[in-house]
A protein has these predicted regions:
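Nucleotide donor/acceptor-binding cores
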Residues: 35-37
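Core SAM-dependent methyltransferase catalytic element
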Residues: 180-182, 186-205
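A conserved beta-strand element that flanks and buttresses the S-adenosyl-L-methionine
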Residues: 100
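Class I SAM-dependent methyltransferase SAM/SAH-binding core
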Residues: 39-41, 45-88
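A short glycine-rich, Lys/Arg-flanked "PGG" loop and its adjoining helix->strand segment in the class I
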Residues: 114-126
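C-terminal alpha-helical "lid/dimerization" subdomain adjacent to the S-adenosyl-L-methionine
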Residues: 48, 133-180, 186-187
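Conserved class I S-adenosyl-L-methionine
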Residues: 1-33, 47
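Short catalytic micro-motifs in class I SAM-dependent methyltransferases
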Residues: 103-104
């Protein structure tokens, strides 16, 4: 993940003011359902896991960027984050009560994003939950929000931007999740209806 080698050092500092309300919403959801085993897929710098640990919830994370994981190792709150491909997790089936990912699916090509969703589903316990934070653009999304999101994604680089546009064109999260047995539990919007926090429950096929 070479594209993150330079950005990892300032990633949290740059984005934290915008993402912080979302991080705290995720914390509120975790508190509400009292999850015991938590996995953060594509955990980046571990910011969400550190916030959860600060409030008494232990979890672990995986990411494919050594630079991001190097940042995750720093700070007062120590969390367990591992270098691993989210499309081929080593975890056994149905291991976690909650599997979450934030702002990861839109930046992957479609096949990779689908595989990550499949793997998240595999390692989630029956009756457990999957929480996804990502872009969801619709007629309810403000023009300002759409412009800001497209600009941010353009800044992230050609491949990232290409995958983002494909994600939006194909239908975003609804399309990625359409073939899964997941049932929506809760949803919350941020960024003038441009970002969704989506909680889903794994039910038997």
């Amino acid at each position: 993940m070479k594209e993150y080698q330079q950005s990892a050092k300032y990633y949290d500092r740059l984005l934290a003011p915008f993402i912080r309300p979302i991080r705290y919403k995720v914390l509120k959801v975790v508190k509400k359902y009292h999850y015991k085993t938590i996995l953060d897929v594509c955990c980046g710098t571990g910011d969400q896991l550190k916030l959860l640990k600060k409030h008494g919830f232990a979890g672990e994370g995986i990411d494919l960027s050594e630079a991001m994981l190097a940042v995750a190792e720093k700070g007062k709150e120590k969390v367990s984050c591992f270098l691993e491909d989210a499309t081929q997790m080593h975890y056994s089936d149905a291991k976690f009560d909650l599997v979450m990912t934030a702002f990861a699916l839109h930046e992957k090509n479609h096949a990779t994003a689908q595989k990550i969703v499949e793997e998240m589903l595999r390692v989630t316990a029956e009756g457990g939950d999957i929480l996804i934070v990502d872009y969801e653009l619709s007629e309810k999304t403000s023009l300002l929000s759409k412009m800001a999101i497209y600009f941010i994604e353009w800044l992230a680089g050609k491949e990232h931007y290409r995958n983002f546009k494909s994600y939006i064109k194909k239908g975003g999260l609804p399309e990625l999740l359409s073939a899964t047995p997941l049932k929506e539990v809760e949803r919350y919007y941020f960024g003038q209806h441009g970002i969704v926090v989506l909680l889903l429950r794994k039910e038997g096929r």
